[in-house]
Amino acid sequence: MISVSGYRLRPEDIEKLNVSQTQRDIANRMLAMPSGYRYGSISELLFELRFREHTVKSARELINSGAKFATFSKTYGNEEFWRVTPEGALELKYRAPASKAIRNIFESGPSYAFECATAIVIIFYMALLKTIGDQTFDRNYQRIILYDWHYERLPIYTDKGNDYLPGDCLYFKNPEFDPSRPQWRGENAILLENNLYAAHGLGILSGETIIEKLNGLRKPHAQTSAYLLSQVTRVDIPALIQMIR
């Protein structure tokens, strides 16, 4: 269900929107969901649709960039734009344009290595950059630290449920992971389309294949399979719009 200023949108309203086919497909999926998506204006809804389309594209681009998976202790990045902290965070350098720094991760992927939650935040930043443009992004994001689920001025939240949409982050949990490789206790992944995910360190895979790979990374004699959690992590678009100058 989609509500705009208290008005519940119908399928014919979605058909009238001046959007791409990908965005229209996302809107129709939102319309069919039992949970409500509420916006103060049509422009907020259009922002969300653009952001989700850019999230899907950016997730694919990051997987294909050559950026590596690494634990925090082995994180590295292009030192022209980023300083690696002792904790393994990538901190935007003073006076470095945030737009160029984020784009560089996608353009010079082999110069970077980071873990999967950091990858999700990077994808969200890139999607936002594509949505609002370089100047607005640089004005609003003069300080960025890429570290796990740390983020600046990006209202990310997690809810229980199964109302998954393209551009959402989902989590595959591996309860009996190998203790010698704790980085494989689970995998964050962006939903690209029905049962197709972008998972940093694994690739673009079906849900079944992600589970199969995680099961291969369990401790000896493990009995419990990895599984997809009934939760979704996404950006609160109306709140984000209020934050951007």
Swiss-Prot record:
Q: Does the keyword Membrane apply?
A: no
The alphabetized UniProt keywords are: Acyltransferase, Sporulation, Transferase
State the EC number(s).
2.3.2.13
Q: One GO MF term, please? A: protein-glutamine gamma-glutamyltransferase activity
The protein's enzyme class: transferase
Tagged with keyword Transferase: yes
One Pfam family recorded for the sequence: TGL
User: Which superkingdom?
Assistant: Bacteria
Q: Which reaction does it catalyse?
A: L-glutaminyl-[protein] + L-lysyl-[protein] = [protein]-L-lysyl-N(6)-5-L-glutamyl-[protein] + NH4(+)
Q: Name one GO biological process term.
A: sporulation resulting in formation of a cellular spore
Which NCBIfam families does the entry mention? PRK03187.1
As for what it does, the entry says: Probably plays a role in the assembly of the spore coat proteins by catalyzing epsilon-(gamma-glutamyl)lysine cross-links.
Record-stated family? Belongs to the bacillus TGase family.
Protein name (Swiss-Prot/TrEMBL): Protein-glutamine gamma-glutamyltransferase
Gene expressing this chain? tgl
